[in-house]
Design a protein with these regions (language model features):
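Phosphate-group recognition and catalysis centered on beta-loop-alpha active-site segments
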Residues: 1-230
């Protein structure tokens, strides 16, 4: 796997800055993260923006769906009262040359915009597009086979081996509770890599890395890097 997702900051450095904002991604760089994970939705006018919740109530205090706002409207809001919602292009531009990027697509309909942003920034070799939605991963691969995709999952089922094969994924991203030695052996047998989420405990991170996962996603890359010695 050419991209480096060994230590991936979840939504940047979500424990330290307003999640999925530019300050959070810059903090991940300061922490020594090798990559960041982010979430993408389309605005009403088709702009790929970086935000975890479609309903913006928790993050901005405004009861609105980001998919029903224009980008101009969404950009006026402040995440946790601190920073604005960035576009995917802004985050990719900031990450280029600094970080690999795990782009989680939360909802179908933004795949083309994601692919175009990755192409424009020349970052196909530095990104991994992930989703719980197989059709989204399939759409990304059809638009640009050079962009790697990864299958997100919470609980393991062997059907995910077939899903990974059908969408052309070389990476699966199970929740850490699903990771077992048997699972990792199955994945290696199919030529698949594993990145796991969301790991905030140093002891757990050491165990998972010792078992052979290729990367851990964490809310606090500063603390985990120091504690585990990454």
């Amino acid at each position: 796997m050419p991209r480096n997702f060994l230590l991936t900051g979840h939504r940047g450095a979500a424990a330290l800055e307003a999640e999925n904002t530019l300050p959070s991604f810059y903090k991940a760089v300061e922490c020594g993260a090798t990559a960041v994970e982010l979430d993408v939705y389309p605005t009403r006018d088709g702009v790929a923006v970086v935000v975890h919740d479609e309903d913006l109530s928790r993050l901005t205090g405004v009861s609105a769906l980001v998919t029903q706002l224009t980008y101009a409207e969404a950009s006026r809001l402040r995440v946790l009262g601190r920073a604005r919602i960035p576009t995917l292009r802004e985050v990719l531009a900031m990450a280029k040359g600094r970080l690999s990027v795990d782009i989680e697509v939360k909802k179908p309909g933004v795949e083309r915009e994601v692919v175009e942003a990755v192409r424009e920034l020349g970052m196909a070799q530095d990104v991994l597009v992930t989703s719980f939605i197989p059709s989204t991963l399939e759409a990304v691969r059809k638009l640009d086979p050079s962009i790697e995709v990864g299958v997100l999952l919470e609980e393991w089922d062997d059907e995910y081996l077939a899903i990974a094969e059908s969408v052309g994924a070389r990476v699966v991203l199970p929740h850490y509770s699903a990771i077992t030695g048997e699972l990792l052996q199955k994945l290696r047998g199919r030529g698949l890599s594993a990145i796991t989420w969301t790991v905030n405990d140093a002891e757990l991170a050491r165990k998972l890395l010792g078992m052979g996962v290729e990367g851990v996603i964490t809310d606090n890359p500063c603390a985990l890097r120091t504690a585990v010695g990454l």
